[in-house]
Amino acid sequence: MTESLDLELDGINTEQRLLERRKAASERERLKQEVEDMVNLHQCKRGIFCVVKQAKLTYEKTTTGNRLSYKLPTQRQKLVLMVGEKPITVTQHSAETEGCLHFPYQGPEDLCTLIKTMCGIRDLIPFN
């Protein structure tokens, strides 16, 4: 018997595990699509500079609530200021930022609430 397949003689337990894995994978895919749809529908005054649009988001439903995890990529900004006739170049780097929002309740609008919170998070928590 191969260890990677976890096959059993009767096959019933193996079949049950495979069905559970398929169901879990299907649910993860559905949640991933739901997040993509919410991100595409999200509109605010920040436009493409909104954290919701810039971050890589993953959404999980658990027995203790819902979690929206985010990962913001490294960013580099460059600004040239003129002082008299001499240019001053300012370069700023921000490190990769990751975190998550945990919503301990279950409801039909949980993802929407988490997306709105994520949108306003830049005002609450300073990102570089």
Swiss-Prot record:
Its main location: host cell. The keyword Zinc-finger does not apply. GO terms for biological process: symbiont-mediated perturbation of host defense response; symbiont-mediated suppression of host apoptosis; symbiont-mediated suppression of host NF-kappaB cascade. Keywords: Early protein, Host cytoplasm, Host nucleus, Host-virus interaction, Inhibition of host caspases by virus, Inhibition of host NF-kappa-B by virus, Modulation of host cell apoptosis by virus. It is found in: Host cytoplasm; Host nucleus. InterPro entries: Adeno_E3-15. One of its GO terms (cellular component) is host cell nucleus. Belongs to the adenoviridae E3_15 family. May prevent Nf-kappaB activation by immune signals like Tumor necrosis factor, presumably by inhibiting NFKB1 dimer DNA-binding. May act directly at the TNF receptor to inhibit signaling. May bind to host IKBKG, OPTN and RRAGA. This is Early 3 14.7 kDa protein.
